[in-house]
Design a protein with these regions (language model features):
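Hydrophobic helical membrane-anchoring modules
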Residues: 1-10, 19-21, 158, 181-242
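Hydrophobic targeting segments
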Residues: 8-14, 23, 30, 42-47
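Donor nucleotide-sugar binding loop of glycosyltransferases
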Residues: 19-23, 54, 109
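Short, well-formed alpha-helical segments that are part of the catalytic scaffolds
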Residues: 19-35
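Acidic donor-binding segment of Leloir-type glycosyltransferases
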Residues: 30-75
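Acceptor/aglycone-binding surface of glycosyltransferases and processive sugar-polymer synthases
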Residues: 71, 78-93, 110-186, 213-223, ...
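Short aromatic/hydrophobic "clamp" motif used to bind/position activated sugar donors
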Residues: 99
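The conserved acidic donor/metal-binding loop of glycosyltransferases
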Residues: 103-107
Length: 242
């Protein structure tokens, strides 16, 4: 258990946006995997930011979870950005010596958090992530993802990473505190990877299986893909220096 005034070994930032009741089962799966591993010194940062006027039960569900679970840290604010804004707000609430980032929709297996934790705790790496060796989410999503990763490597040809948007991502606190993250939209994963490169962080990538989302439609479509590309090009032109 986390002792009063002590910081946890691991903070798990879970993006809960519009997950509603599905987030309850996902949290249970995460905690089951941590329990099997014998990892008790952790916190769950549950990011349930919302759009004003939009019907979404997730904030209330997360508040209820946090009232019953002392390891849960709720982050609930009216949204002033997209996915990146949620991630940055979650990072700001995380206190762990290691910070994990994962979506709460069940497509990324919770057991991967433990797999990456083991790799990171070896002390060899500052940053560890998955790459999706097998995908069960359909040909359309696979095509969009491959096209996006191809374009990323065209614009940033010396980037060695295999799968930019794959999660979980685990990073040491020291490395996270050095990152300059500003993207409020869908390119946040790309910005993280470019910061890994800028800071010359040691990293590892571990293969995983990416599941189909059984209980809600994905938020990733051609519109979000184009937003990611626009942000990628803007980053290439205005911010990145080889």
């Amino acid at each position: 258990m986390i002792q009063p005034n002590n910081k946890p070994s691991l903070s798990i930032v879970i993006l809960c946006y519009r997950s509603e009741e599905g987030i309850i089962g996902f949290i249970r799966q995460v905690e089951d995997e941590l329990r099997i591993e014998g990892l008790e010194d952790y916190e769950l940062v549950l990011v349930a930011n919302y759009i004003a006027g939009q019907s979404d039960k997730t904030p209330d569900i997360v508040r209820q979870v946090a009232s019953e679970n002392p390891r849960a840290v709720p982050v609930i604010m009216e949204k002033h950005g997209g996915m990146g804004w949620d991630v940055i707000s979650g990072f700001g609430a995380a206190n762990g010596a290691v910070v994990a980032l994962i979506d709460g929709d069940g497509q990324m297996p919770p057991k991967d958090i433990v797999r990456l934790w083991r790799v990171l705790k070896s002390g060899e790496f500052d940053f560890v992530k998955t790459f999706r060796k097998q995908r069960l989410d359909g040909s359309h999503r696979i095509f969009v993802s491959r096209w996006y990763n191809w374009l990323f490597h065209v614009l940033f040809p010396t980037s060695p990473y295999r799968d930019i948007n794959s999660k979980p991502k685990l990073i040491t606190r020291k490395a996270l505190d050095q990152m300059q993250l500003h993207c409020s939209g869908w390119f946040l994963d790309g910005e993280i990877m470019l910061e890994v490169r800028r800071l010359n962080l040691s990293f590892a990538e571990v293969p995983t299986v990416f599941n189909n989302n059984e209980w809600r439609a994905s938020f990733v479509n051609w519109k979000t893909a184009l937003e990611m590309v626009s942000s990628m090009i803007e980053y290439r032109v205005h911010y990145w220096r080889e």
